[in-house]
């Protein structure tokens, strides 16, 4: 069993409170390494806190149950606590914690829509895609806003 933290470091210009658009149904995508055969799998897994599954041979539940295609080891993933909105421009911050049994998280793949608020105007930006740098204009604050230099990392929690 291991707990892993998803960490973010990004340059925020004119925005704050970066988070998934609908955290309850948001799918987080990760590349994983099986702790049985040590294979890093090419296809990403997707985990959502809105899904729960019974863990085979256990009374517990997980957000995802996954079986390694190489060694058939069963892995479970649980999202612990809410996503912590990112506000700390250019500082690495833990934004999410997951408990993983049978696998390790090795890479986060940003996908889906994210939201942020204007730092000065509180304008809601609700269609942010983080696959690359993001730029927009905050009409209420009359200034450009951006999210750049995104660096996602995974560490032991």
From Swiss-Prot:
It comes from the Eukaryota. It holds the Pfam family CXXC_Zn-b_euk. GO terms for cellular component: cytosol; nucleus. InterPro entries: CXXC_Zn-binding_euk. Keywords: Metal-binding, Zinc. Zn(2+) binds at residues 34, 37, 68, 71. One of its GO terms (molecular function) is zinc ion binding. Disruption phenotype: No obvious growth defects. No increased sensitivity to oxidative stress caused by exposure to hydrogen peroxide (in vitro). The keyword NAD does not apply. Belongs to the UPF0587 family. PANTHER family: CXXC MOTIF CONTAINING ZINC BINDING PROTEIN (PTHR12857:SF0). Requires a bound zinc ion for normal folding and solubility. This is UPF0587 protein C2D10.03c. It comes from Schizosaccharomyces pombe (strain 972 / ATCC 24843) (Fission yeast). The lineage of its organism: Eukaryota, Fungi, Dikarya, Ascomycota, Taphrinomycotina.
């Amino acid at each position: 069993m291991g707990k892993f933290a998803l960490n973010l470091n990004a340059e925020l210009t004119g925005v704050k409170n970066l988070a998934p658009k609908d955290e309850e149904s948001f799918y987080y995508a990760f590349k994983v390494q099986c702790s049985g055969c040590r294979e890093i799998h090419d296809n990403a897994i997707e985990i959502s806190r809105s899904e729960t599954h019974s863990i085979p041979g256990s009374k517990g539940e997980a957000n995802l149950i996954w079986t390694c295609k190489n060694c058939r080891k069963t892995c479970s993933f649980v999202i612990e606590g809410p996503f912590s909105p990112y506000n700390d421009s250019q500082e690495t911050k833990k934004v999410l914690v997951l408990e993983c049994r049978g696998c390790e998280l090795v890479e986060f793949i940003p996908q889906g829509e994210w939201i942020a608020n204007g730092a000065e105007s509180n304008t809601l930006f609700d269609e942010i895609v983080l696959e690359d740098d993001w730029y927009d204009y905050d009409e209420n604050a009359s200034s450009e806003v951006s999210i750049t230099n995104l660096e996602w990392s995974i560490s032991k929690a």
